[in-house]
Amino acid sequence: MSRRNAAVKRPILPDPQFNSRLASMMVARLMKHGKKSTAQRILSDAFGLIGERTGADPLEVFETAVRNSTPLVEVRARRVGGATYQVPMEVRQERGTAMALRWLVNFSRSRGGRSMAQKLAGELMDAANEAGSAVRKREETHKMAEANKAFAHYRY
C-alpha cells in the first residue's frame, strides 16, 4: 500500500460556454490528445443539433441523458478462498456520473458514420428517452448486481 498522502481532489470548474460542471466533465471525456477546443466544438455542435431536433433546452436533455445512464449498483470481483465472486456494490455518485459519461462517449464513438457531434447528439437524445446503448449498459449492470445479490455479504 502506498505511503504517500492521498492526491488532493481538484475542483471541477464549470464549462465557460454552458456554465455547467457536467458539460466540462463531458468535454474532458471527449478530448483526445489534449485537443480541448475540438472537444468543446463537438459538444457545442451536438447541443445545437439536440436543440434543433427536440426544441428543448439541450443542457436539460444532456442532464437527463446522464441521469438515465448513471448506474446505482455494480459488481466487483472479490476473491474468497480460491473462488472469485462478483459482489454487488453501490456506486458513489461521482463514480456513477463518470461511468455514465464514459459510456455515452464510447457508445457514441461506436455508432456508424457521420460526424462525432451527430453521433453524440443521437446517443444523448436516445439516453434522454430511456433508450440507447448507454442506458442498456446501465440495465445490464443492474441485472448483474441483482443476479449476484447472494454474494452481497462479501462486500468490503
Curated annotation (Swiss-Prot):
Signal peptide: none annotated. InterPro entries: Ribosomal_uS7 (IPR000235), Ribosomal_uS7_bac/org-type (IPR005717), Ribosomal_uS7_CS (IPR020606), Ribosomal_uS7_dom (IPR023798), Ribosomal_uS7_dom_sf (IPR036823). The keyword Ribosomal protein applies. It holds the Pfam family Ribosomal_S7. One of its GO terms (cellular component) is small ribosomal subunit. Keywords: Ribonucleoprotein, Ribosomal protein, RNA-binding, rRNA-binding, tRNA-binding. It comes from the Bacteria. Disulfide bonds: none annotated. GO terms for molecular function: rRNA binding; structural constituent of ribosome; tRNA binding. GO terms for biological process: translation. Belongs to the universal ribosomal protein uS7 family. One of the primary rRNA binding proteins, it binds directly to 16S rRNA where it nucleates assembly of the head domain of the 30S subunit. Is located at the subunit interface close to the decoding center, probably blocks exit of the E-site tRNA. Part of the 30S ribosomal subunit. Contacts proteins S9 and S11. HAMAP family: Ribosomal_uS7_B. This is Small ribosomal subunit protein uS7. The lineage of its organism: Bacteria, Bacillati, Cyanobacteriota, Cyanophyceae, Synechococcales. The gene is rpsG.
